[in-house]
Curated annotation (Swiss-Prot):
Protein name (database record): Large ribosomal subunit protein bL9
GO biological process, one term: translation
Alphabetically ordered keywords of this record: Ribonucleoprotein, Ribosomal protein, RNA-binding, rRNA-binding
Species, as recorded: Chlamydia muridarum (strain MoPn / Nigg)
Functional summary from the UniProt entry: Binds to the 23S rRNA.
The family this protein is said to belong to: Belongs to the bacterial ribosomal protein bL9 family.
PANTHER family: 50S RIBOSOMAL PROTEIN L9
Pfam families: Ribosomal_L9_C, Ribosomal_L9_N
Entry-linked InterPro entries: Ribosomal_bL9, Ribosomal_bL9/RNase_H1_N, Ribosomal_bL9_bac/chp, Ribosomal_bL9_C, Ribosomal_bL9_C_sf, Ribosomal_bL9_N, Ribosomal_bL9_N_sf
Gene Ontology molecular-function annotations: rRNA binding; structural constituent of ribosome
Entries under HAMAP family matching the protein: Ribosomal_bL9 (MF_00503)
Single GO cellular component term: ribonucleoprotein complex
Length: 167
């Protein structure tokens, strides 16, 4: 028989803090109990459930507000990437999730790998791209990227400097 557990933390694919769940014995024995993410349900832990659910509701409201604020910030933000390309404008490598996270961090936007869909493996073409992000509490947002060749950026800077010299 699978044991009934009280989750102390949110666990992806299983439940939220304060939920009573049933999981496979190996998952319970090897992951949930040693990591402190759950306890075996008993009369004492069931009293703890109400307190955990109340805390979860407060945290959920704060997380949703933070996610909505982040989504509003992302609406007006475009992350610009310069990449090396060959003579046929094929990129060397790709713009990875880690690259996106670091550039967003430089712009003051905090993202994590959890925000990106699992299927997203990186941007491998030049141009404008939109990536759907999954934020906390079911809030979604679009992240706008512009991937340009490094020689295009150098040409734009030259044109700007020439225009400034003419003025």
């Amino acid at each position: 028989m699978k044991p009934q557990l009280l989750l102390l933390e949110d666990v992806d694919g299983l439940g939220r803090s304060g939920d009573l769940v049933v999981a496979k014995p190996g998952y319970v024995r090897n992951y949930l109990l040693p990591k402190g993410k759950a306890v075996v349900a008993s009369a004492g832990t069931l009293r703890l459930q109400a307190k955990l659910q109340e805390q979860r509701l407060l945290q959920a409201a704060a997380d949703k507000e933070e996610s909505l604020r982040l989504a509003e910030t992302l609406r007006s933000l475009v992350l610009d990437f310069q990449v090396r390309v060959d003579s046929e404008n094929n990129m060397y490598g790709s713009v990875t999730v880690n690259d996106i996270i670091s550039v967003a961090d430089q712009k003051g936007v905090v993202l994590t790998r959890k925000n990106f869909p699992r299927a997203h493996s990186g941007v491998k073409t030049l141009g404008k791209h939109v990536i759907g992000l999954k934020l906390k509490e079911g809030v979604t947002a679009d992240l706008h990227l512009e991937v340009r060749a490094d020689h295009e950026i150098a040409e734009q800077k030259e044109l700007q400097s020439m225009e400034e010299q003419e003025d």
